[in-house]
């Protein structure tokens, strides 16, 4: 007989540091998610700095996915669109409810949960999925990052000129590749850059990165010293990069 042990802690102090000793296979470290961008952003940012504590056999569950709900959940907490009506579970403060997200925001949500090693539990009604929702939830390239056998936590590299809203998450993979998520939480499109020395690959190493785009499903080429791209507001780029000699 097999069983899965899940502990619901909801942001108890230092849960990351002691939860593995409990024997739990999954643990909740956040309040409940809601189907709006501000909730997704808040939960994701709450994980920055604690990425290293999850791992094989003890996974950090950032709550289910709201991808594809589009304001259509039958749960009042998740779906309310009234400004200031609901209360955020983990802080007690009110915030506006936006009645669902754009497909771009759902794509970012899925990418964040994947690279942060959270379980990818579908929350929408799969009988009513749009083609865009199905495309997001069945992206094999992004799912492969989440399911990497070594389950290493990512580390965060903040954009120097906008550290509160623009950052990259870099996750080493079992075969030596890097999974790279570049996220723009701001309200304007912006140019993002990843300097390779920040991941231990200076120009003097004679190595660069061969980069594959996990959402466009295409090879982008080989880059040295840095990778630069434009990321839409509330959007992301998810890359799989292989170290190559240049």
Identify the residue ranges that each predicted region occupies:
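Glycan-recognition surfaces
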Residues: 1-125
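Generic recognition of flexible, low-complexity loop/linker segments
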Residues: 100-102, 165-170, 226-227
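Carbohydrate-binding surface patches
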Residues: 107, 113-116, 121-123, 161-203
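Catalytic cores of secreted or luminal carbohydrate-active enzymes
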Residues: 108-160
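Short, glycine-/Ser/Thr-/acidic-enriched flexible segments
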Residues: 120, 127, 150, 185-187, ...
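Hydrophobic, well-ordered secondary-structure elements that form the walls
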Residues: 180, 211, 234
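Solvent-exposed beta-hairpin/edge-strand motifs
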Residues: 197-216
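C-terminal beta-strand-rich structural cap/linker in extracellular carbohydrate-active enzymes
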Residues: 221-246
